[in-house]
Amino acid sequence: MDSITTAASVVAAGLAVGLGAIGPGIGQGTAAGGAVEGIARQPEAEGKIRGTLLLSFAFMESLTIYGLVVALVLLFANPFAG
C-alpha cells in the first residue's frame, strides 16, 4: 500500500468515527433530556419512558458502531490497497 493511500485511509477512518459519533451524541442528549422532562411530568410512567429510552439509545448507538466498522475496514482490510 503506497503512502498516499495509507494516509487517506487513516484520515478517512478518523472522520468516519468522529462524524459518525456527532449525530448519535446529539440525539442521545436530546432524547435523555426529553425523558427526564417526561418523568418529571408523569412519574408513574417512568418504566415505559425508561424502556423506550433504552431502546432508542440502542438504535442511535448502532450508527456509531457502523462508523467504527467502516474505520476498522479502512485500517485493516482496505479495499483500496493495491
UniProtKB/Swiss-Prot annotation:
Alphabetized UniProt keyword annotations: ATP synthesis, CF(0), Hydrogen ion transport, Ion transport, Lipid-binding, Membrane, Thylakoid, Transmembrane, Transmembrane helix, Transport
Site entry (Reversibly protonated during proton transport), positions: E61
Quaternary state and interactors: F-type ATPases have 2 components, F(1) - the catalytic core - and F(0) - the membrane proton channel. F(1) has five subunits: alpha(3), beta(3), gamma(1), delta(1), epsilon(1). F(0) has four main subunits: a(1), b(1), b'(1) and c(10-14). The alpha and beta chains form an alternating ring which encloses part of the gamma chain. F(1) is attached to F(0) by a central stalk formed by the gamma and epsilon chains, while a peripheral stalk is formed by the delta, b and b' chains.
GO cellular component: plasma membrane-derived thylakoid membrane; proton-transporting ATP synthase complex; proton-transporting two-sector ATPase complex, proton-transporting domain
Membrane topology field: Multi-pass membrane protein
Gene name as annotated: atpE
Major localization class: membrane
Protein name: ATP synthase subunit c
Pfam families reported for this sequence: ATP-synt_C
Family (UniProt): Belongs to the ATPase C chain family.
Molecular function GO labels: lipid binding; proton-transporting ATP synthase activity, rotational mechanism
Domain of life (superkingdom): Bacteria
Lineage, highest ranks first: Bacteria, Bacillati, Cyanobacteriota, Cyanophyceae, Synechococcales
Compartments it resides in: Cellular thylakoid membrane
The species this protein was found in: Prochlorococcus marinus (strain MIT 9313)
PROSITE patterns per the UniProt record, alphabetical: ATPASE_C
Transmembrane segments: 7-27, 57-77
Its biological purpose: F(1)F(0) ATP synthase produces ATP from ADP in the presence of a proton or sodium gradient. F-type ATPases consist of two structural domains, F(1) containing the extramembraneous catalytic core and F(0) containing the membrane proton channel, linked together by a central stalk and a peripheral stalk. During catalysis, ATP synthesis in the catalytic domain of F(1) is coupled via a rotary mechanism of the central stalk subunits to proton translocation. Key component of the F(0) channel; it plays a direct role in translocation across the membrane. A homomeric c-ring of between 10-14 subunits forms the central stalk rotor element with the F(1) delta and epsilon subunits.
